Amino acid sequence: MKMKRTVSSNSEAYSYNESPHSPLRFHSPLSDAGDLPESRYVSPEGSPFKIENPKSIVAGNKLTQFSPLPSPIPPPPPQIPPPRRQRNARVPMNSSLDKSPSSMVVQNSWVREDGQQNTTRKAGAPMNGEESATTAVNRARRDDLVSVTALGFRITEVILCVISFSIMAADKTQGWSGDSYDRYKEYRYCLAVNVIAFVYSAFEACDAACYMAKESYMMNCGFHDLFVFSMDQLLAYLLMSASSCAATRVDDWVSNWGKDEFTQMATASIAVSFLAFGAFAVSALISSYRLFTHASS
Protein backbone atom coordinates (compact mmCIF):
# COMPACT_ATOMS: atom_id res chain seq x y z
CA MET A 1 0.00 0.00 0.00
CA LYS A 2 2.85 2.37 0.79
CA MET A 3 4.36 1.82 -2.59
CA LYS A 4 1.13 2.68 -4.35
CA ARG A 5 0.57 5.86 -2.28
CA THR A 6 4.10 7.07 -3.03
CA VAL A 7 3.75 6.41 -6.72
CA SER A 8 0.41 8.16 -6.86
CA SER A 9 1.76 11.22 -5.08
CA ASN A 10 4.70 11.43 -7.44
CA SER A 11 2.45 11.09 -10.44
CA GLU A 12 0.19 13.84 -9.13
CA ALA A 13 3.16 16.16 -8.58
CA TYR A 14 4.48 15.35 -12.02
CA SER A 15 1.15 15.82 -13.68
CA TYR A 16 0.72 19.22 -11.90
CA ASN A 17 4.15 20.42 -12.99
CA GLU A 18 3.50 19.27 -16.54
CA SER A 19 0.11 20.91 -16.59
CA PRO A 20 -0.20 23.93 -18.87
CA HIS A 21 -1.90 25.79 -16.04
CA SER A 22 1.16 25.59 -13.84
CA PRO A 23 2.93 28.97 -13.33
CA LEU A 24 6.22 27.15 -13.73
CA ARG A 25 5.45 26.39 -17.35
CA PHE A 26 4.15 29.86 -18.22
CA HIS A 27 7.46 30.95 -19.78
CA SER A 28 8.56 27.44 -20.65
CA PRO A 29 8.86 26.42 -24.29
CA LEU A 30 6.78 23.36 -23.36
CA SER A 31 3.85 25.55 -22.35
CA ASP A 32 0.72 25.06 -24.41
CA ALA A 33 -0.01 28.78 -24.25
CA GLY A 34 3.12 29.53 -26.19
CA ASP A 35 4.97 32.80 -26.02
CA LEU A 36 3.33 35.88 -24.63
CA PRO A 37 2.29 38.48 -27.15
CA GLU A 38 4.87 41.21 -27.50
CA SER A 39 3.86 44.46 -25.85
CA ARG A 40 3.23 47.42 -28.10
CA TYR A 41 5.23 49.63 -25.77
CA VAL A 42 8.48 47.72 -26.38
CA SER A 43 10.87 49.65 -28.59
CA PRO A 44 12.15 47.65 -31.59
CA GLU A 45 15.56 49.19 -31.16
CA GLY A 46 17.87 48.77 -28.26
CA SER A 47 17.99 51.34 -25.52
CA PRO A 48 20.76 53.89 -26.08
CA PHE A 49 21.44 54.00 -22.37
CA LYS A 50 23.61 51.44 -20.66
CA ILE A 51 21.84 49.58 -17.89
CA GLU A 52 24.20 48.85 -15.05
CA ASN A 53 22.04 46.40 -13.13
CA PRO A 54 19.48 44.76 -15.40
CA LYS A 55 18.65 42.09 -12.82
CA SER A 56 17.13 44.64 -10.52
CA ILE A 57 14.84 45.81 -13.31
CA VAL A 58 13.81 42.27 -14.24
CA ALA A 59 13.27 41.38 -10.64
CA GLY A 60 11.17 44.45 -10.19
CA ASN A 61 9.08 43.65 -13.23
CA LYS A 62 8.61 40.06 -12.11
CA LEU A 63 7.67 41.21 -8.63
CA THR A 64 5.12 43.61 -9.99
CA GLN A 65 3.71 41.36 -12.68
CA PHE A 66 3.74 37.86 -11.16
CA SER A 67 3.27 38.51 -7.44
CA PRO A 68 0.19 36.63 -6.19
CA LEU A 69 -0.43 39.45 -3.66
CA PRO A 70 -1.96 42.77 -4.69
CA SER A 71 0.50 45.54 -5.32
CA PRO A 72 0.64 48.02 -2.45
CA ILE A 73 -0.79 51.41 -3.53
CA PRO A 74 0.90 54.40 -1.94
CA PRO A 75 -1.48 56.47 0.15
CA PRO A 76 -2.70 59.67 -1.46
CA PRO A 77 -0.97 62.86 -0.34
CA PRO A 78 -2.78 64.74 2.42
CA GLN A 79 -5.06 67.41 1.04
CA ILE A 80 -4.46 70.80 2.61
CA PRO A 81 -7.63 72.88 2.65
CA PRO A 82 -7.22 76.17 0.80
CA PRO A 83 -6.97 79.25 3.01
CA ARG A 84 -10.24 81.00 3.69
CA ARG A 85 -10.69 83.96 1.40
CA GLN A 86 -10.77 87.16 3.36
CA ARG A 87 -13.34 89.85 2.77
CA ASN A 88 -10.87 92.41 1.40
CA ALA A 89 -8.61 89.95 -0.44
CA ARG A 90 -7.62 90.86 -3.95
CA VAL A 91 -7.15 87.72 -6.03
CA PRO A 92 -5.91 88.27 -9.60
CA MET A 93 -8.03 86.88 -12.43
CA ASN A 94 -5.29 84.66 -13.89
CA SER A 95 -4.44 82.91 -10.63
CA SER A 96 -4.28 79.07 -10.83
CA LEU A 97 -4.61 76.32 -8.26
CA ASP A 98 -1.04 75.09 -8.73
CA LYS A 99 0.51 78.12 -7.06
CA SER A 100 3.52 77.51 -4.93
CA PRO A 101 3.03 77.79 -1.15
CA SER A 102 5.49 80.66 -0.94
CA SER A 103 3.51 82.83 -3.35
CA MET A 104 0.27 82.09 -1.49
CA VAL A 105 1.89 83.06 1.79
CA VAL A 106 2.98 86.36 0.28
CA GLN A 107 -0.52 86.93 -1.06
CA ASN A 108 -2.12 86.24 2.33
CA SER A 109 0.31 88.47 4.20
CA TRP A 110 -0.38 91.30 1.75
CA VAL A 111 -4.12 90.89 2.24
CA ARG A 112 -3.71 90.74 6.01
CA GLU A 113 -1.70 93.95 6.08
CA ASP A 114 -4.25 95.66 3.88
CA GLY A 115 -7.04 94.51 6.18
CA GLN A 116 -5.19 95.86 9.23
CA GLN A 117 -4.74 99.22 7.56
CA ASN A 118 -8.42 99.42 6.67
CA THR A 119 -9.43 98.45 10.20
CA THR A 120 -7.15 101.05 11.74
CA ARG A 121 -8.40 103.73 9.40
CA LYS A 122 -12.04 102.94 10.09
CA ALA A 123 -11.54 102.72 13.84
CA GLY A 124 -10.45 106.36 14.04
CA ALA A 125 -13.34 107.66 11.94
CA PRO A 126 -16.34 108.96 13.89
CA MET A 127 -19.73 107.36 13.53
CA ASN A 128 -22.58 109.13 11.79
CA GLY A 129 -24.45 109.69 15.05
CA GLU A 130 -21.44 111.23 16.79
CA GLU A 131 -20.66 113.42 13.80
CA SER A 132 -24.23 114.72 13.57
CA ALA A 133 -24.33 115.39 17.32
CA THR A 134 -21.04 117.30 17.18
CA THR A 135 -22.28 119.32 14.20
CA ALA A 136 -25.49 120.17 16.02
CA VAL A 137 -23.60 121.32 19.13
CA ASN A 138 -21.23 123.48 17.08
CA ARG A 139 -24.11 125.02 15.17
CA ALA A 140 -25.97 125.82 18.39
CA ARG A 141 -22.90 127.52 19.85
CA ARG A 142 -22.35 129.50 16.67
CA ASP A 143 -25.98 130.64 16.61
CA ASP A 144 -25.76 131.77 20.24
CA LEU A 145 -22.60 133.76 19.51
CA VAL A 146 -24.19 135.39 16.46
CA SER A 147 -27.31 136.28 18.47
CA VAL A 148 -25.29 137.91 21.26
CA THR A 149 -23.19 139.85 18.73
CA ALA A 150 -26.30 141.04 16.88
CA LEU A 151 -27.92 142.23 20.12
CA GLY A 152 -24.75 144.10 21.09
CA PHE A 153 -24.60 145.97 17.79
CA ARG A 154 -28.32 146.79 17.98
CA ILE A 155 -27.82 148.41 21.36
CA THR A 156 -24.82 150.30 19.97
CA GLU A 157 -26.93 151.58 17.08
CA VAL A 158 -29.64 152.77 19.46
CA ILE A 159 -27.14 154.70 21.55
CA LEU A 160 -25.32 156.27 18.59
CA CYS A 161 -28.49 157.28 16.74
CA VAL A 162 -30.06 158.87 19.80
CA ILE A 163 -26.85 160.83 20.48
CA SER A 164 -26.61 161.98 16.87
CA PHE A 165 -30.15 163.28 16.46
CA SER A 166 -30.16 164.74 19.97
CA ILE A 167 -27.10 166.87 19.23
CA MET A 168 -28.50 167.91 15.87
CA ALA A 169 -31.88 168.82 17.39
CA ALA A 170 -30.14 170.96 20.01
CA ASP A 171 -28.01 172.81 17.46
CA LYS A 172 -29.49 176.32 17.82
CA THR A 173 -27.88 179.62 18.65
CA GLN A 174 -29.41 182.88 19.90
CA GLY A 175 -28.59 186.47 19.14
CA TRP A 176 -28.15 188.53 16.01
CA SER A 177 -25.89 185.84 14.57
CA GLY A 178 -28.10 182.99 15.80
CA ASP A 179 -28.88 180.06 13.57
CA SER A 180 -30.77 176.76 13.70
CA TYR A 181 -30.50 173.37 12.03
CA ASP A 182 -34.06 173.55 10.62
CA ARG A 183 -32.99 176.24 8.20
CA TYR A 184 -30.82 173.75 6.26
CA LYS A 185 -32.18 170.76 4.47
CA GLU A 186 -28.93 168.78 4.88
CA TYR A 187 -29.23 168.93 8.65
CA ARG A 188 -32.92 168.07 8.57
CA TYR A 189 -32.14 165.10 6.34
CA CYS A 190 -29.46 163.84 8.74
CA LEU A 191 -31.79 164.29 11.72
CA ALA A 192 -34.66 162.39 10.06
CA VAL A 193 -32.48 159.45 9.05
CA ASN A 194 -31.04 159.15 12.55
CA VAL A 195 -34.52 159.14 14.06
CA ILE A 196 -35.66 156.37 11.70
CA ALA A 197 -32.52 154.39 12.40
CA PHE A 198 -33.05 154.82 16.14
CA VAL A 199 -36.63 153.48 15.99
CA TYR A 200 -35.65 150.54 13.81
CA SER A 201 -32.59 149.61 15.88
CA ALA A 202 -34.63 149.80 19.10
CA PHE A 203 -37.22 147.43 17.62
CA GLU A 204 -34.54 145.02 16.40
CA ALA A 205 -32.84 145.08 19.80
CA CYS A 206 -36.10 144.00 21.45
CA ASP A 207 -36.58 141.36 18.76
CA ALA A 208 -33.08 139.96 19.32
CA ALA A 209 -33.61 139.86 23.09
CA CYS A 210 -36.92 138.03 22.58
CA TYR A 211 -35.22 135.50 20.32
CA MET A 212 -32.52 134.81 22.90
CA ALA A 213 -35.10 134.36 25.66
CA LYS A 214 -37.86 132.42 23.84
CA GLU A 215 -36.10 131.33 20.63
CA SER A 216 -38.83 133.03 18.60
CA TYR A 217 -39.00 136.47 16.98
CA MET A 218 -41.57 139.13 17.74
CA MET A 219 -42.41 139.27 14.05
CA ASN A 220 -42.39 135.54 13.38
CA CYS A 221 -42.97 135.25 9.65
CA GLY A 222 -41.39 133.52 6.72
CA PHE A 223 -39.61 136.61 5.36
CA HIS A 224 -38.16 137.86 8.69
CA ASP A 225 -34.51 137.37 7.71
CA LEU A 226 -35.06 138.96 4.31
CA PHE A 227 -36.80 141.95 5.91
CA VAL A 228 -33.99 142.51 8.44
CA PHE A 229 -31.30 142.19 5.77
CA SER A 230 -33.06 144.69 3.49
CA MET A 231 -33.62 147.24 6.27
CA ASP A 232 -30.03 147.04 7.48
CA GLN A 233 -28.75 147.63 3.96
CA LEU A 234 -31.16 150.50 3.34
CA LEU A 235 -30.50 152.34 6.62
CA ALA A 236 -26.74 151.93 6.26
CA TYR A 237 -26.86 153.64 2.84
CA LEU A 238 -29.18 156.36 4.16
CA LEU A 239 -26.93 157.12 7.11
CA MET A 240 -23.91 157.35 4.83
CA SER A 241 -25.79 159.64 2.45
CA ALA A 242 -27.19 161.91 5.19
CA SER A 243 -23.88 162.19 7.01
CA SER A 244 -22.05 163.03 3.79
CA CYS A 245 -24.57 165.74 2.87
CA ALA A 246 -24.39 167.30 6.34
CA ALA A 247 -20.59 167.18 6.29
CA THR A 248 -20.57 169.01 2.95
CA ARG A 249 -22.77 171.76 4.38
CA VAL A 250 -20.54 172.19 7.44
CA ASP A 251 -17.45 172.43 5.25
CA ASP A 252 -19.08 175.11 3.11
CA TRP A 253 -20.10 177.10 6.20
CA VAL A 254 -16.63 176.92 7.75
CA SER A 255 -14.91 177.93 4.49
CA ASN A 256 -17.14 181.02 4.20
CA TRP A 257 -17.75 182.14 7.79
CA GLY A 258 -15.32 180.20 9.94
CA LYS A 259 -15.94 177.98 12.93
CA ASP A 260 -18.39 178.72 15.70
CA GLU A 261 -20.56 176.89 18.23
CA PHE A 262 -23.20 176.01 15.63
CA THR A 263 -20.78 174.31 13.26
CA GLN A 264 -19.05 172.48 16.08
CA MET A 265 -22.31 170.87 17.26
CA ALA A 266 -23.20 169.93 13.70
CA THR A 267 -19.77 168.37 13.24
CA ALA A 268 -20.20 166.29 16.42
CA SER A 269 -23.62 165.05 15.30
CA ILE A 270 -22.26 164.09 11.88
CA ALA A 271 -19.33 162.20 13.42
CA VAL A 272 -21.66 160.11 15.61
CA SER A 273 -23.85 159.49 12.58
CA PHE A 274 -20.87 158.04 10.73
CA LEU A 275 -20.26 155.70 13.70
CA ALA A 276 -23.89 154.61 13.53
CA PHE A 277 -23.36 153.82 9.85
CA GLY A 278 -20.48 151.50 10.79
CA ALA A 279 -22.68 149.67 13.32
CA PHE A 280 -25.42 149.21 10.73
CA ALA A 281 -22.89 147.88 8.23
CA VAL A 282 -21.85 145.15 10.70
CA SER A 283 -25.51 144.36 11.41
CA ALA A 284 -26.09 144.02 7.67
CA LEU A 285 -23.31 141.42 7.50
CA ILE A 286 -24.84 139.48 10.39
CA SER A 287 -28.31 139.56 8.85
CA SER A 288 -26.94 138.39 5.49
CA TYR A 289 -25.19 135.49 7.23
CA ARG A 290 -28.44 134.48 8.90
CA LEU A 291 -30.39 134.81 5.69
CA PHE A 292 -28.16 132.61 3.55
CA THR A 293 -27.47 130.11 6.36
CA HIS A 294 -31.15 129.49 7.01
CA ALA A 295 -31.86 129.36 3.29
CA SER A 296 -29.22 126.65 2.75
CA SER A 297 -30.36 124.59 5.75
UniProtKB/Swiss-Prot annotation:
Biased composition (Pro residues): 69-83
Chain spans, region Disordered: 1-136
Pfam families with a match to the protein in the record: CASP_dom
Transmembrane spans: 150-170, 190-210, 226-246, 266-286
Keyword tRNA-binding: no
Domain of life: Eukaryota
Keyword Transcription: no
Biased composition (Low complexity): 8-19
Extracellular side: 171-189, 247-265
Topology with respect to the bilayer: Multi-pass membrane protein
Topological domains annotated Cytoplasmic: 1-149, 211-225, 287-297
Oligomeric form and interacting partners: Homodimer and heterodimers.
Similarity comment: family membership: Belongs to the Casparian strip membrane proteins (CASP) family.
Protein name stated in the entry: CASP-like protein 4A2
Originating species: Arabidopsis lyrata subsp. lyrata (Lyre-leaved rock-cress)
Lineage of origin: Eukaryota, Viridiplantae, Streptophyta, Embryophyta, Tracheophyta
